[in-house]
């Protein structure tokens, strides 16, 4: 008869074997012994399924088939990093740091792993949830697939409740083996290890993810300060003591010269690593100095990513095609003989505009040098003129739009040629793709391929038509089944409730980006107010300059725009700003003004997003972790370690009912 004590002993033994092998790269037993212990564990679990926990080593082999990936909100945003491409960029970064916090600084330099950013949540030392970065605010729940990565411990060495960030990746050797198998089976090959890792973590069948031999390096906690450390380097050391895998090739540098030396070293040695890196990350080491530097909307001001110089590769320029963007700009695109650049196969590259082609004397048939700008976007650097045979053809931009045959114009102070026909099909199609994108109306399931199908089959001619699509028509599209169509229609319906700034950005008004759209929405509150605004009123608003104001006035003077807005209203699309408007609230109403608030536990009446929105509307900033800098903790039922820490630090604790008292009288956020 199986002994539960022996079962628990086996779990601890197998966890230690995995730690030795996958985390510190120091195997202590032969594979046969590991396999024997695992088989013993599996037999016990078969006899006693009631003993099995999510932390069992048996859960790493996969087997669970998922229905899909739920959305996960990051309590602390997973910000991206600003890039540096040369010593001058790094010197500017260093100067900004010193101007703010003084000269007593040090930088932790780490290898920038070319993988997929993920977040791991541990509760009382046990692995609870894993998620992708997503857009930094909302990611996808990939808990089950991350569990298959052997270097991720299911239990920490201490019972901490923390959120850890890191980079999941596929080692070069695993990538090579995977592509060899796919080639034998006649499947499409992965372009690079990063794509392979991302694809593996989005498998619905966890057995597939388990077979891909992924790995991970952890590089941060959502809030290192709550761990009682004062520096980033001490935080990384702490992660190692918890049993988490941290890259050992890090170095603390006290000067830019030391940073440059570290960069030069790894620029030379990067090819020798067992995994891909695409740069070096610098982080201000002192956590208090990090706090002083703060963050922008997108990235921390205390960290920067140095990107390695782009690889330059020669290939043949076969042709030049013209693309029409949503604002009518005509962009020439190089059609290339396929070639591998920075880990992916490139067959097309931007040529930007006619002036650049003329200036660089780029001709069809040339051998050209291409690179990836920032290792992402392919571009043509120059023609290799000494390889010309005389058969190459100079390129001349047409005088008419390649899509609608309208006359092309060059507007004052612009380099690009532009089609100004508002009914140009290419512009309408690109505008539709923009309208449904993540930063605009964010309609899940309406990707570029679906938009192109809808447009080519004349099911939509403008953005308003999206809101009148029927289930019957959608089911006629390729690869659109009952479930996909139901989900898509639900997503379209949900998007009608978006706040005004989302709609404004989605409409694609020239020069109006996401930030300006938010400023306009906050100031005017309704579309009706905005569309009658004059230039003087517009330019009085932060972020709105003369050129943008002219563009907005011109846009709303168009009768076709009025008709479009009426159609959107008829469809039930919200045309008011529904976000917080702090400047109109009194000090008494702004109960959380300038305060940091932490939500913990299960809320009964408010969703977590509603609670967060309410706190922000009252002037507060919502954080994911409790520290000495926390001003208030709002605790629901089953609140755990965060509540205990708040009590220990004597931080004021609110109940959900306390928070609900501040809901607006007209019904508030939870209706």
Curated annotation (Swiss-Prot):
Alphabetical GO biological process terms: DNA repair; DNA replication
Cofactor(s) essential for the protein: Mg(2+); Mn(2+)
InterPro entries named in the record: BRCT_dom, BRCT_dom_sf, DisA/LigA_HHH, DNA_ligase, DNA_ligase_CS, DNAligase_adenylation, DNAligase_N, Hlx-hairpin-Hlx_DNA-bd_motif
EC number: 6.5.1.2
Residues involved in Zn(2+) binding: 401, 404, 419, 424
GO molecular function: DNA binding; DNA ligase (NAD+) activity; metal ion binding
GO CC, any one term: cytosol
UniProt-listed SUPFAM superfamilies: BRCT domain, DNA ligase/mRNA capping enzyme, catalytic domain, Nucleic acid-binding proteins, RuvA domain 2-like
Functional description taken from the UniProt entry: DNA ligase that catalyzes the formation of phosphodiester linkages between 5'-phosphoryl and 3'-hydroxyl groups in double-stranded DNA using NAD as a coenzyme and as the energy source for the reaction. It is essential for DNA replication and repair of damaged DNA.
Name used for this protein in its record: DNA ligase
Organism in which the protein naturally occurs: Listeria monocytogenes serovar 1/2a (strain ATCC BAA-679 / EGD-e)
Gene: ligA
């Amino acid at each position: 008869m199986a002994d539960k004590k022996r079962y628990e002993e086996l779990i601890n033994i197998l966890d230690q074997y995995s730690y030795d092998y996958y985390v510190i790269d120091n195997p202590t037993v032969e594979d046969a012994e590991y396999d024997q212990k695992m088989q013993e564990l599996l037999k016990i679990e078969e006899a006693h399924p009631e003993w099995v926990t999510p932390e069992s080593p048996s859960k790493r082999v996969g087997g669970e088939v998922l229905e899909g990936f739920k959305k996960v909100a990051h309590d602390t945003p997973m910000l991206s990093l600003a890039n540096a491409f040369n010593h001058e960029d790094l010197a500017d970064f260093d100067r900004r740091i010193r101007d703010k916090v003084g000269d007593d600084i040090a930088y932790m330099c780490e290898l920038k792993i070319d993988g997929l950013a993920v977040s791991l949540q541990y509760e009382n030392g046990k692995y609870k949830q894993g998620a992708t970065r997503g857009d930094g605010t909302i990611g996808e729940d990939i808990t089950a697939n991350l569990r298959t990565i052997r270097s991720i411990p299911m239990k920490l060495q201490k019972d901490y409740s923390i959120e850890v960030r890191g980079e999941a990746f596929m080692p070069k050797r695993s990538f090579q083996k995977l592509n060899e198998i796919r080639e034998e089976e006649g499947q499409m090959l992965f372009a690079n290890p990063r794509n392979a890792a991302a694809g593996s973590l989005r498998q619905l069948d966890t057995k597939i993810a388990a077979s891909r031999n992924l790995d991970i390096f952890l590089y941060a906690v959502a809030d290192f300060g709550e761990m009682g450390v004062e520096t980033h380097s001490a935080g990384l050391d702490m992660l190692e003591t918890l049993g988490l895998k941290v890259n050992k090739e890090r170095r603390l540098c006290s000067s830019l010269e030391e940073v440059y030396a570290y960069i030069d070293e790894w620029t030379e040695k990067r090819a020798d690593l067992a995994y891909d890196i695409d740069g070096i990350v610098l982080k201000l080491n002192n956590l208090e100095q990090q706090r002083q530097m703060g963050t922008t909307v997108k990235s921390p001001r205390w960290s920067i990513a140095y990107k390695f110089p782009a690889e330059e590769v020669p290939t043949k320029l076969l042709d030049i095609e013209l693309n029409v963007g949503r604002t009518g700009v005509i962009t020439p695109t190089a059609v290339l003989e396929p070639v591998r650049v920075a880990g992916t196969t490139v067959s097309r590259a931007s040529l930007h505009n006619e002036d650049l082609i003329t200036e660089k004397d780029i001709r069809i048939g040339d051998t050209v040098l291409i690179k990836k700008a920032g290792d992402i976007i392919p571009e043509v650097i120059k023609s290799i003129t000494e390889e010309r045979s005389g058969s190459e053809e100079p390129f001349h931009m047409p005088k008419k739009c390649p899509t609608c045959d309208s006359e092309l114009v060059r507007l004052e102070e612009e380099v690009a040629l532009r089609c100004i026909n508002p009914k140009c099909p290419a512009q309408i199609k690109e505008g539709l793709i923009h309208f449904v994108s993540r930063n605009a109306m964010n309609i899940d399931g309406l990707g570029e391929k679906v938009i192109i199908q809808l447009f080519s089959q004349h099911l939509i001619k403008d953005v308003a038509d999206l809101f009148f699509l029927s289930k019957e028509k959608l089911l006629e599209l390729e690869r659109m089944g009952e479930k996909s169509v139901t989900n898509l229609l639900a997503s379209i319906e949900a998007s009608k409730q978006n706040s005004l700034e989302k709609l404004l950005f989605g409409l694609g008004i020239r020069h109006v980006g996401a930030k300006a759209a938010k400023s306009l929405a906050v100031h005017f509150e309704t579309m009706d107010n905005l569309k009658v605004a004059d230039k003087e009123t517009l330019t009085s608003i932060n972020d709105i300059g003369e050129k943008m104001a002219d563009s907005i006035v011109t846009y709303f003077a168009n009768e076709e725009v009025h008709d479009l807005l009426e159609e959107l209203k008829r469809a039930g699309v919200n045309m008011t700003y529904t976000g917080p408007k702090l400047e109109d609230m009194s000090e008494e109403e702004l109960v959380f003004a300038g305060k940091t608030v932490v939500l913990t536990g299960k809320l009964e009446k408010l969703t977590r997003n509603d609670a967060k929105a309410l706190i922000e509307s009252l002037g507060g900033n919502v954080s994911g972790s409790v520290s000495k800098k926390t001003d208030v903790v709002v605790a629901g039922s089953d609140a755990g370690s965060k509540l205990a820490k708040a009590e220990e630090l004597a931080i004021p604790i609110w109940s959900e009912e306390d928070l609900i008292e501040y809901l607006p009288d007209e019904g508030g956020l939870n209706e």
